[in-house]
């Protein structure tokens, strides 16, 4: 689950380069890319929560408790609907970006879902974070920060991306992903983390 931290940051930073590489040909212009990137970044904020829900929910199923995850899911769904109205209209009114409100509401509701699932397992004494897990989380966050700084420094300006052909964009995206991954793993190694720990 910790891998969601670097994945979230990388996707947020590379949102526009990814979109320009995949879609900005012909009628798909700079404004479309900007709007889509804003929505993608809002969804990205919930990436960790989406992963946690998939990990935490089976903890209830293993105890033959089918009702709690469903009840929590309903709470998250209702919250999502309420947040849609709270986010969409202000963003549409002030920034003409109501679609970002939909994505943001989904991410917030996902975090609520994950938090309630974790609280349920924690109260039941099934899931307790040990000190080693907290230390590991700090190492992951520090390594992800190093990766983010590198990506922000080496990612070309968007005006350059639009001048490239599709294969030039693709190669650059691949190189950026590899560079970010290398920076993350190297930083993690220096801090005492090991790759096999990511499987935990």
Positions of predicted regions on the chain:
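Membrane-embedded alpha-helical bundles of multi-pass transporters/translocases
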Residues: 1-200
């Amino acid at each position: 689950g910790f891998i969601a931290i670097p994945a979230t940051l990388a996707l947020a930073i590379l949102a526009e380069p990814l979109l320009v590489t995949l879609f900005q040909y012909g009628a798909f212009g700079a404004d479309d890319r900007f709007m889509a990137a804003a929505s993608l970044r809002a969804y990205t904020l919930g990436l960790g929560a989406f992963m946690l829900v998939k990990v935490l929910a089976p903890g209830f199923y293993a105890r033959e408790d089918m009702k709690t995850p469903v009840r929590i899911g309903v709470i998250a769904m209702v919250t999502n609907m309420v947040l849609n109205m709270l986010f969409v209209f202000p963003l549409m009114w002030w920034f003409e970006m109501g679609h970002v409100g939909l994505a943001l509401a989904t991410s917030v509701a996902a975090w609520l879902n994950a938090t309630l699932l974790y609280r349920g397992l924690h109260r039941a004494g099934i899931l307790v974070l040990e000190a080693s897990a907290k230390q590991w989380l700090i190492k992951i966050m520090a390594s992800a920060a190093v990766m983010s700084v590198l990506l922000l420094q080496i990612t070309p300006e968007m005006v350059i991306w639009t001048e490239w052909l599709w294969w030039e964009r693709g190669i650059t995206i691949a190189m950026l992903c590899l560079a970010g991954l290398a920076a993350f793993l190297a930083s993690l190694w220096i801090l005492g983390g090991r790759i096999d720990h990511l499987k935990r």
